[in-house]
Amino acid sequence: MKKRLAIAISFLLAFMLFLSACGGSTIRMATGGNTGTYYAYGTAIGQVLGEKTDLSFNIQSTGASKANIQLIAAGEVDLAIVQNDVMDYAYKGTDLFTGEQTQDFSAMAALYAEVCQIVADPSAGITSIEDLKGKNVSVGDAGSGVEFNAKQILEAYGITFDDINKQNLSFSASADALKDKKIDAFFCTAGAPTSAITDLATSNAITILNVDDEHAQALIADYPFYAQYPIPAGTYNGVDEEVKTLAVKATFIVSNKLSEDTVYQMTKALFENKDAITTAHAKGAELDPAYAVESISVPFHPGAEKYFKEIGALS
């Protein structure tokens, strides 16, 4: 009996080793809500990388950045899309992650810009960030990354939340409130163009406020996850001049438990299959190795670092 059990166990171990040698590991990817960009883009990337590597991808709809970091820390996912500012908070235990510090993840690659857009009603007499004092301003959902973006940008101009009539509204609710003259301005951190602002600009005059170079550089010095970003003229109806602002980055992070080889394989496939990814989702056009390593304030996973050094994106 014992001999037969030993033979069975040996066979099972050999079979498991065979499966391991054949590859086919499943990567659990956390994205965002199933109607959002994170989910659609993550699905597109998973499909392409699943075809181009020996990995398969299980795409999960989630509550986005903070939830995704918590899922990696809990060992429930292996790969996630997050904003690089929220990633910074988690790694350092600040802001959204005060008292909840986690360093169970590493950076893999920045993917695309999420632009800090400050939209104002020109009839409210707002032409600059300084003009927001005393105004009704939505700063995004309470406790969101957008709220912290708003807090940091305002503070760079000497304005606190006590200096405005702060409201916490979603992007679409903010756009509706501005249209109905219930607020004077709102903060929105998202790709540019983004639908809430595009829809608003088709029926209402809007102004998008500049973050000037001096204040932008001061913010970047304090918060290295920011980068300067120009919103091209014509991005929104009636906004006919370039707007200078800041952006954070939608970024892939990975569990520290993933092997160097697995993360190297994913990173390499991500950039070598840019055309196929772009065909599957328009955000693929922003994939760029040089951009992928800028404004990343946490360590890269050794597998990602190996790839970026190999192609000269990191020294």
Question: Residues of each region from the PLM?
Answer:
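Pocket-lining segment of extracytoplasmic ligand-binding domains
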Residues: N84-V86, T94-L96, Q103, A124, ...
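Short helix-loop capping/hinge motifs at secondary-structure junctions, enriched
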Residues: P122-I129, L258-D261, L314
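Ligand-binding clefts/hinges and TM-proximal coupling segments of bilobed small-molecule sensing domains
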Residues: K135-Q152, F225-I296
